[in-house]
């Protein structure tokens, strides 16, 4: 018997990838961020009603996307409720790889008089948050549960044992961590492995061409720990615009700082050469810098989502990556600058021990290169047309 070959996906979003070396679940190369879905924060973030949110979810899903990110406190709970209603109406829960988060005070606008234990990393906060998330999402399991941030009061032992209890009982499949120092993540994973518990498989945090702190410790930590990366803020949070564009539209997003202005000009220049958008270059940039990178892409407009999906086909050369790096100098800090940098050599994330200048005194060393990211597919479909 000859087994059929899977049909060609409708867009590049449908070519799925392994989440991380420690999590074999298959996910779309972009993760749909949903923080704007809801009425709870419309006074601050602008309006994104349920119809618009469902349209975004439908477009993402119909384009082949299955990786959706929510959190317990987004929009006062509207986000989880709406995503839960959407999955129930579409009857596609098991097709979706759903991530949510606990730690933030998700009852801040609720009726409870005493709210101190509805936030934090501790066991009670975790139990209450996951129970509420499962109800709002209309599901009996969460694919990926993040510690949203480290509270610096709960012990590593309590966090990892409490999280593992949820995994052992089938309520959670994989664990992630967000907005937490690298040394704490390593400590958590070491404790988990030493005690037969589930370690973290994914890290979520702020990373873009203008905000490269991620590259100091988080990126090498994830490489060493076998963790995937789900960076947010990749598109510059509305700041990656040329001076001309920002003069027209920037009033809605606050002032543009000099760093984003310089990078916006560089990204815009490169985008014009490639007949694309500056934000598409920004997205391709992080996906070219390391393997297992799944940008969290949000927003309220379907046309922007389609641009993000089409950007999956963008190819950046090593020289173009270097140009973006050099547009805004980045100090990697000690000890990496001491080990790798010289008057003629700047630190790059793909460097290995052969690039340590102190070791070149006695020998010319050749080393195995670091693992490279998946190259963008060429010739796959976008929206009704073939890529070139």
UniProtKB/Swiss-Prot annotation:
Positions that bind substrate: 148
Role this protein plays: Norsolorinic acid reductase; part of the gene cluster that mediates the biosynthesis of aflatoxins, a group of polyketide-derived furanocoumarins, and part of the most toxic and carcinogenic compounds among the known mycotoxins. The four major aflatoxins produced by A.parasiticus are aflatoxin B1 (AFB1), aflatoxin B2 (AFB2), aflatoxin G1 (AFG1) and aflatoxin G2 (AFG2). Within the aflatoxin pathway, the norsolorinic acid reductase aflE may play a role in the conversion of norsolorinic acid (NOR) to averantin (AVN).
GO terms assigned for molecular function: oxidoreductase activity
Active site residues of this protein: 74 (proton donor)
Disulfide bonds: none
Entries under SUPFAM superfamilies matching the protein: NAD(P)-linked oxidoreductase (SSF51430)
Domain of life: Eukaryota
Keyword terms, alphabetized: NADP, Oxidoreductase
EC number, UniProt record: 1.1.1.-
Record pathway: Mycotoxin biosynthesis; aflatoxin biosynthesis
Organism: Aspergillus parasiticus (strain ATCC 56775 / NRRL 5862 / SRRC 143 / SU-1)
Record's note on what induces expression: Natural plant compounds carvacrol (CR) and trans-cinnamaldehyde (TC) strongly reduce the expression.
Gene Ontology annotations of biological process type: aflatoxin biosynthetic process
Protein family according to the UniProt entry: Belongs to the aldo/keto reductase family. Aldo/keto reductase 2 subfamily.
Top enzyme class: oxidoreductase
Stated name of the protein: Norsolorinic acid reductase A
Ligand binding (NADP(+)): 69, 178-179, 204, 233-243, 300-308
PANTHER family: NADH-SPECIFIC METHYLGLYOXAL REDUCTASE-RELATED (PTHR43364), NADP-DEPENDENT OXIDOREDUCTASE DOMAIN-CONTAINING PROTEIN-RELATED (PTHR43364:SF7)
């Amino acid at each position: 018997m000859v087994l059929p070959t899977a049909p060609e996906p409708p867009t590049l979003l449908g070519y799925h990838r392994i989440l991380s070396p420690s999590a074999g679940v298959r996910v779309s190369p972009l993760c749909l961020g949903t923080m704007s879905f809801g009425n709870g924060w419309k006074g601050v973030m602008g309006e994104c009603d349920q119809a618009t949110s469902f349209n975004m979810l439908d477009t993402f899903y119909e384009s082949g996307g299955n990786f959706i990110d929510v959190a317990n406190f987004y929009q006062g709970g509207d986000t989880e409720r709406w995503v839960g209603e959407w999955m129930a109406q579409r009857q596609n829960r098991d097709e979706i790889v759903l991530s949510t988060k606990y730690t933030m005070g998700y009852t801040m606008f609720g009726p409870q008089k005493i709210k101190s234990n509805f936030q934090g990393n501790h066991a009670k906060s975790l139990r209450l948050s996951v129970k509420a998330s499962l109800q709002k999402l209309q599901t009996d399991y969460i694919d990926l549960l993040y510690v949203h941030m480290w509270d610096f009061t709960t012990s590593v032992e309590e966090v990892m044992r409490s999280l593992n209890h949820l995994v052992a009982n089938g309520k959670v499949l994989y664990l992630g961590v967000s907005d937490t120092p690298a040394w704490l993540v390593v400590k958590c994973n070491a404790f988990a492995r030493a005690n037969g518990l589930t370690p973290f498989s994914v890290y979520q945090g702020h990373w873009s061409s203008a905000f490269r702190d991620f590259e100091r410790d988080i990126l090498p930590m994830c490489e060493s720990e076998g963790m995937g990366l789900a960076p947010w803020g990749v598109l510059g949070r509305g700041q990656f615009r040329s001076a001309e564009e920002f003069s027209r539209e920037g009033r809605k997003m606050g002032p543009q700082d000099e760093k984003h202005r310089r990078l916006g000009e560089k990204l815009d220049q490169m985008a014009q050469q490639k007949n694309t958008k500056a934000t598409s270059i920004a997205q391709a940039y992080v996906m070219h810098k390391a393997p297992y990178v799944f940008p969290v892409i949000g927003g309220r407009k379907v046309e922007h989502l389609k641009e993000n999906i089409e950007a999956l086909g963008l190819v950046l050369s090593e020289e173009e990556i270097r140009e973006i790096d050099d547009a805004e100098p980045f100090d990697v800090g000690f000890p990496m600058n001491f080990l790798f940098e010289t008057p003629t050599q700047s630190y790059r994330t793909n460097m290995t021990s052969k690039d340590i200048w102190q070791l070149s005194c006695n020998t010319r060393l050749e080393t195995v290169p670091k693992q490279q990211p998946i190259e963008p597919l060429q010739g796959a479909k976008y929206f009704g047309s073939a890529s070139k």
